[in-house]
UniProtKB/Swiss-Prot annotation:
GO CC, alphabetical: extracellular region
Claim: Secreted is one of the keywords in the record: yes
Domain of life: Eukaryota
Coiled-coil regions, chain positions: none
Function: Myoactive.
UniProtKB keywords: Amidation, Neuropeptide, Secreted
Phenylalanine amide PTM sites in chain numbering: F9
Protein location: Secreted
Gene Ontology biological process terms from the UniProt entry: neuropeptide signaling pathway
Protein name, per record: FMRFamide-like neuropeptide PF5
Amino acid sequence: AMRNALVRF
């Protein structure tokens, strides 16, 4: 789930 946060970068 946390990976979704960096996927934006």
